[in-house]
From Swiss-Prot:
Residues 65-109 form the LysM domain. Residues 1-54, 122-169, 187-208 are annotated as: Disordered. Residues 27-42 have a biased composition (Low complexity). Pfam families: LysM. Residues 129-140 have a biased composition (Polar residues). This is LysM and putative peptidoglycan-binding domain-containing protein 2. SMART domains: LysM (SM00257). It comes from Danio rerio. Residues 147-156 have a biased composition (Pro residues). CDD domains: LysM.
Amino acid sequence: MAEFSPVLPPLRDDGGGGRYGQPLFPRSRSGSESDSELSQSLARTKTRSYGSTASVTAPLGEKYIEHRVTDGETLQGIALKYGVTMEQIKRVNKLFSNDCIFLRNTLSIPVKSEKRSLFNGLSLESPDSEGNTPQESPCVSQDVDAPSPPPEPSVPEPNTRPVQAEELSAKDYLHRLDLQIKQSKLAARKLKEDGGREEDDTNSYQEI
């Protein structure tokens, strides 16, 4: 079978006849060179975050405490003491196994910092804490030159006084007044008669 060669684009004619340039495909490089260039390009892209000067790989809110290793201690016990994982201690101190802690006199324990950490200029605080902070009410300024809205038409209040079914005339009022006077006179006369009868009864009782 015939071998297919890459297409060679022609170069400009300089007067010395048509010549062919280099092939479209670049020359194959060694594996070490390509790997090193790839790692360098990835490192350049990860050093800075978009729109900020903060480093992506920088530790966020993390500080280290020096712990002195004593006999009988285990990596699990140290991790439980400081509230971290064994993988974090091994990563910071570059330990390959749990038994390697006795090869070092001290260990660096990563703990969370109490200070607020900033990432891309923003605080890493949880949104729950923001809800507890009191919010200031916005100040609303009124424009003096703006025309005031027209007053609303006043609604007449309902009459709370009970309306009588029949209005009393002056004649009816005087008639009722006369009846009350007559009734009071009759009552006074009756009381007087009752008092006279009691006196007569007492006098007759004394005579007996």
